Amino acid sequence: MKAYKGFNKDMTCNPNGNVFQFEEGKTYEEAEAKLCESGFHACEAPLDVLRYYAPHGSVYHEVELDGVSDERKEDSKVCARKIRIGARISILNL
C-alpha cells in the first residue's frame, strides 16, 4: 500500500519515547502491527501526516507498506509490519 510518513528532520521517529532511525531506500520490518502500539505508522491521505509531524522541523516521504493492520481511527493513519522508505517529498507536494 502506498502511504505518506512524516519524520523528524534527522529521519527519526520517537514511538513510545524510543528513537528509531530511518534511511531513504531502506526496508524495515517488525513482528506485529498494532495501531499506536507497534509496527510502522503512516497515512494514506498525504495531508494527514501534518497532524503528527508539523512542517517546521519535519520531513516527509512516500512509503510502501506491507502487512497492514485493519485497525483505523479518526483519520487515514495505518499501521504495518513492513515499511519501505521512498523518496522525500516537499510539503507542497503532499
Language-model regions, residue ranges each:
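Short, glycine-biased loop/turn motifs at secondary-structure junctions and
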Residues: 1-94
